[in-house]
Amino acid sequence: MIEDKGPRVADYFVVAGLTDVSKPLEEEIHFNDACHKVAKPKEPITDVSVIIKSLGEEVPQDYICIDVTPTGLSADLNNGSLVGPQIYLCYRRGRDKPPLTDLGVLYDWKERLKQGCEIIQSTPYGRPANISGSTSSQRIYITYRRASENMTQNTLAVTDICIIIPSKGESPPHTFCKVDKNLNNSMWGSAVYLCYKKSVAKTNTVSYKAGLICRYPQEDYESFSLPESVPLFCLPMGATIECWPSNSKYPLPVFSTFVLTGASAEKVYGAAIQFYEPYSEENLTEKQRLLLGLTSADGKSDSSKTIHTNKCICLLSHWPFFDAFRKFLTFLYRYSISGPHVLPIEKHISHFMHKVPFPSPQRPRILVQLSPHDNLILSQPVSSPLPLSGGKFSTLLQNLGPENAVTLLVFAVTEHKILIHSLRPSVLTSVTEALVSMIFPFHWPCPYVPLCPLALADVLSAPCPFIVGIDSRYFDLYDPPPDVSCVDVDTNTISQIGDKKNVAWKILPKKPCKNLMNTLNNLHQQLAKLQQRPRDDGLMDLAINDYDFNSGKRLHMIDLEIQEAFLFFMASILKGYRSYLRPITQAPSETATDAASLFALQAFLRSRDRSHQKFYNMMTKTQMFIRFIEECSFVSDKDASLAFFDDCVDKVDMDKSGEVRLIELDESFKSEHTVFVTPPEIPHLPNGEEPPLQYSYNGFPVLRNNLFERPEGFLQAKKNKLPSKSSSPNSPLPMFRRTKQEIKSAHKIAKRYSSIPQMWSRCLLRHCYGLWFICLPAYVKVCHSKVRALKTAYDVLKKMQSKKMDPPDEVCYRILMQLCGQYDQPVLAVRVLFEMQKAGIDPNAITYGYYNKAVLESTWPSRSRSGYFLWTKVRNVVLGVTQFKRALKKHAHLSQTTLSGGQSDLGYNSLSKDEVRRGDTSTEDIQEEKDKKGSDCSSLSESESTKGSADCLPKLSYQNSSSIVRLTGTSNNSAGKISGESMESTPELLLISSLEDTNETRNIQSRCFRKRHKSDNETNLQQQVVWGNRNRNLSGGVLMGFMLNRINQEATPGDIVEKLGADAKILSNVISKSTRPNTLDIGKPPLRSKRDSLEKESSDDDTPFDGSNYLADKVDSPVIFDLEDLDSETDVSKAGCVATQNPKRIQRMNSSFSVKPFEKTDVATGFDPLSLLVAETEQQQKEEEEEDEDDSKSISTPSARRDLAEEIVMYMNNMSSPLTSRTPSIDLQRACDDKLNKKSPPLVKACRRSSLPPNSPKPVRLTKSKSYTKSEEKPRDRLWSSPAFSPTCPFREESQDTLTHSSPSFNLDTLLVPKLDVLRNSMFTAGKGVAEKASKWYSRFTMYTTSSKDQSSDRTSLSSVGAQDSESTSLTDEDVCHELEGPISSQETSATSGTKRIDLSRISLESSASLEGSLSKFALPGKSEVTSSFNASNTNIFQNYAMEVLISSCSRCRTCDCLVHDEEIMAGWTADDSNLNTTCPFCGNIFLPFLNIEIRDLRRPGRYFLKSSPSTENMHFPSSISSQTRQSCISTSASGLDTSALSVQGNFDLNSKSKLQENFCTRSIQIPANRSKTAMSKCPIFPMARSISTSGPLDKEDTGRQKLISTGSLPATLQGATDSLGLEWHLPSPDPVTVPYLSPLVVWKELESLLENEGDHAITVADFVDHHPIVFWNLVWYFRRLDLPSNLPGLILSSEHCNKYSKIPRHCMSEDSKYVLIQMLWDNMKLHQDPGQPLYILWNAHTQKYPMVHLLQKSDNSFNQELLKSMVKSIKMNDVYGPMSQILETLNKCPHFKRQRSLYREILFLSLVALGRENIDIDAFDKEYKMAYDRLTPSQVKSTHNCDRPPSTGVMECRKTFGEPYL
């Protein structure tokens, strides 16, 4: 076996002929049936004569008179003439002289005699032989041509003659040629025609079955063995020994072609040349001598005869390069009969087979020089969805004419038995191949033998339809079977027998047939002009005729036009057939695959023209049509072809002119690029000697193996290797590949939309989604829960639809359907089909095939509904009714501004989590049906609502108000929008409700209000606010609304929550003063429905009605980056601890309920975090006891005392994060401030990130009630006197130093943390004193466990939850919270929920200065994604990430030096998918934009993020221990706190309550001096935030800080150490990466090319990062941009680029995306060249007093604090002109430098940072900016640059569509 390596020009070279074992052909052929009547061979006709019977002339001796026609009429040549004589034709047979080769008729009065012809001038009796009578002036004569004396043995001679009278219904007999001239030209009588038959006039021949003489290569290829029957096809009439007269000429070689069809319908093409060679008389047996007539009767031999035999050389290939093969074989034949030669013939054969490359799009033409005089050209096969064919339509039309060609089409489409015959074997193959091509899209399903050997002719007896081509000499031996329609290509006649005679082209539908005939007639005339050459009679000239290249091209074009005409016809008669296909939409029955089930046949027939029902009935009953319907309905290798046909049908449908082109040549055909291949090299001898001419042949030799020149390794067979993919082009389409029609259609759409700004941005978006779906198989593959991943993709589809991308790419639906089939999800496949129909897309054949395959072959869920399900239904109804009642009771307390639309559609969950975990198909699928409706408007990873301003632009109306800063009352559509979205979920969702309480419902409701776009009006719950002292981050409307309501009535916390939504967190201290819970409810049910958790594995999306999803969207505003929190919450980070729980109980909790986090009360009571634990302790013990008795009791029974607590819980849930409750958050600390105690709302200075990520983390359900700990009589100040992370802890540094180096696999924290948690927690519950001791004892251990990995216990807890793949628990992120929350103290709760919901932790996210937005949504499945998508505290966050990636697309134009931002780059791209450039919006020049990527390696010894087990990469913890592991304490070391966010140095005593209250602004951690020095010496740079707008708020400027050095591509504040104190433990960060930023159109093309060349697995391995960085980083950017989950970020972890310095084997490293934090930046400080800093950085420097930027103030006095504040004030007043003027005025003072930054960006970015991103309506800003720009005075205009111009519509549309990256 030889290994296959891509397509080959030729597979085998074969020599066939007479072998020693050949048997006589007559022994081999046995036709036992009656069809094959043996015909008697007839001698050739040597003479023809005319006799006039009316004058008494008689038939001469040995002549035969033709008295009657074939049907018995008189054969008088003047038939019916009144006055003409009766003239008859006579002929004589014999071998005494050369036979006649042609007959003709001469009209003497208007024609001349052709050369070589003779006239029969007189009768045998001397009278004139004028057929029209001697009296007529118009004389007509019979003419003939005779063969030469030394004629070749295969000369065709006339063997039969007849007369026909067509007017009497006669036609030429089979194989007879009609002379198309009427012999009777009198006024009376019928037209009379002469017909004759020609055959080979051979004598003395013995035929044998041909055998294989030799072959090359000797070994078979893996995918294609040499068929045994090849010699039979090489010599179809057998190998013969012939006896010739000695003066006979050698016949020229005959070229023939044949096609072999394998069992899999794969075609192999053969090209052969037959020739004769002398045969030694000595080798003849006596019998052979007798048969050949060499021995006379008296025993003497005849010496005047010579003996010859025929031989054939042949090439076999999968590609029909017939013309090239003909030239090569002819060259070999000539080489064998000439010589001597330097090189052996074997060298030429192996050179052609191995050294000639296969033509490809890159090298469409290969010119092969065979010798100085011989060459050939190989052209790339036309890359078309049409089946590959060796036929030529021009040959068919030229030989048969339009009418017979169309009649042949009718025979084929109605499945007749078709026998095509000719004496020219190459023409035979050409015509039959063209015939099976012209019936496309049907594929001939029956026997098909284009050139049938005589030995296989019994196929003609087959009882089924067939298409067989046969040599016409067959009819010299046999009569044709009676039920076969015979087509004689040589004479252009079709003979039908019996009832088949009525089947002709006229039964076809009239209009399509008329169009077809017109086109064919026109092309037939063109062919006649083009082909003025004599008809090829099967013989070849020795000189290779290179006919004019242009003529060849023209012939090829005519060929395509003929094919297109037939294609147009087929598309016309089948128009609209797809609408009659019936998809399988339910569990398939036994008859599901019957054609009757798959196709509405009767409806189809009724839709056709009634007058042609006969034809349609015949066609639809054929096997071919039924097969066609099956192929359309299921996956087959014909899918690409069928999709192409559907495209043709659409074109025919639309086309009115008839000028549409259905077949378009691809560009490579037009290319002139040609590769030249030289002849084999002649060996060079020393001293310049001539090589000897040692090879000469006296016939074609038997090939010698040792003379072949084989390529290296050619014979090394690969054993045990599966046959590789065949080189045949008919393999099914790979999953990712679009059809050519889809690619062309996408190009057209892109071209059309590129000039329409609104549509261009959507076009780019459409391509981005398409890219994600192409990568979807790789993503699903790594997801633990395939079902969730698929549902995520389904949600993305729905989201695409909501974005009104017209139309979405069909490949997206197709890939998802394929995956549904692959992973057994038929119900989802049905939904995808319905979504497709909803989007207005008719699935093409490929998509439809994969759909039916998915629903047919997958296992459908059982239909029986369990008792559990039915009882759950009853329970839900009861609960639903109750909740409605309670909601009504409390309705009076709800603010009028609340929206009632969202309450009923929150998707209550009726599935237990156990069921979800099990993936119970029955319930799951039942649920799916309901869930489907609920999640219509959301999809995944909150991405719908996360896209800055215009994610759902097409769907939602924009703000009408032109107010830049969003205020109350400006929104007309926000409420409507929300209700519109939420109401898509119908009331039936009530039937799957969970144990939700009314409060919970309201809680959700309040969060629901927040789901809308940041660029949309933010007015749901906001009242207008006075901007006075309001901190820039506070959502003013919320606060004011809160205060106004308090005036009218005493609002309950629930009301406040309703009002505040996400902004509630900022006001936590205000509320906590006034309320405190009566009881701590811990039995709250989970908020999440199954629908919520559907996608947890594969996405971060909680589906639309998950409250936290709503909140997360809006919570951006206040919650994400609360910098003060960072300082204040350090203590808490130390303290989180977790209760022990019975794993079994936890499991039950999973399935039944989850607990609300506890209230955090008066901060002042106990500053030690543990002091906050006390109140929960008793409640916890009590609850645990109850739970041990009966879990469900506490679940289902709402507590009577719970109302107020519920309100608070609800309120706090909306704001807090798990980690924060462990510390008095800055909000709460500020509550201790006197001003805050006066409840002066504007004073709440929650320093929040102003430029927020599009999807902020979801708020965790953690309450922070200030008064909470007051329930404890004794403050527990001393309880946590020595926390592990206490800055004063003497062991800290030592412990880190000693333990960090311990083996990563054997680490204290991995051993101790869960057990310590258990121990500690149980001790806490035992009593206060014990708890105090436990705290001290535990803190010492935590010091070791956490510090050894630098907070690895925190990482452990976080990653354990994240890593705990959601497949195992089927929980959403919140579910994990709940399952951990149980009866636990608030501290424990916060810790555990924090572990899970990193996303919500304020410590983590809000304060995470480094967080550029919710973390990468690329996380791998489930929790892992959630975890990765969001961040724990700044300190904690990087404990859960191995890698942080910062990407900016901001680029600099090379021409004008202006900074071009993301949306401007997008707007400048073109529709050309080969153009990498964009157009600069400022100077109009093109340039190549770049993505700048910086990677921070956060790994260190002990936390390398290795794969946990080979089997389940994502399941880091077995479920049995997961609950405890996940609950490990989230403790944050000082170094941890300092990592990446803020190394804060403040001097104050942690234990001093009063001092703390005074210093609430900067609670920071003291760093031991020596540690500090080390850290600082190693890292002179201040640890920087990843976002310039989130730098830490520090009271004092640290004078010891050194000046910042810009090291990266990001703003200065984005650089620096992520862990200044722990820097020595980090691996070096990988080098920055810069790659071209490509349009999605270009990326798609590149990705397809990559997948095609390297396979689907290419994007699942880390080498993708290293080998294809451009495609990789662009994909990462786009997926992150749209918040789509992906496996790609995980590949960074094990890539070569990121592991240059790592000693750990890459295959051991985790590739889980949850460990990679990806942040997208709008700006790129590295590119800034202006001397000053951007205004938004200066704003932070001035207003936030960031030490890191204080130095900027000294060098940058132009823009002082007052100036910036006045600008911001102007912007609040909708005045952009003022700031513009101020900036221009300031800049004019130093006119010497060339300004690079634009006014637009300066003012916009300042607005976003100063006023909060969520408060700025950028659309309104753009309007105001344009108006202000138009107002500029001429002198001001002179100071502006091009980059100051307002953004164009295209730029604005791209920003709206894709949202804004982060500052």
From Swiss-Prot:
Disulfide topology: none
Chief location bin: nucleus
Ranges of compositional bias, category Low complexity: 936-949
Annotated tissue distribution: Expressed ubiquitously. Highest expression in bone marrow, medium in peripheral blood lymphocytes and lowest in spleen. In brain, breast, and prostate, higher expression was seen in normal cells than in tumor cells. Expression is regulated in a growth- and cell cycle-dependent manner.
Limits of the MABP domain: 42-200
Annotated GO CC locations: cytoplasmic vesicle; cytosol; nucleus
InterPro entries in alphabetical order: cDENN_dom, dDENN_dom, DENN_C, DENN_Domain_GEFs, MABP, Pentatricopeptide_rpt, TPR-like_helical_dom_sf, Tripartite_DENN
Biased segments, Polar residues type: 1297-1306, 1348-1371
Domain dDENN: 523-641
Keyword field: DNA-binding, Guanine-nucleotide releasing factor, Nucleus, Phosphoprotein, Repeat, Transcription, Transcription regulation
Name the record gives this protein: C-myc promoter-binding protein
Source organism: Homo sapiens
Origin organism lineage: Eukaryota, Metazoa, Chordata, Craniata, Vertebrata
Name of the gene: DENND4A
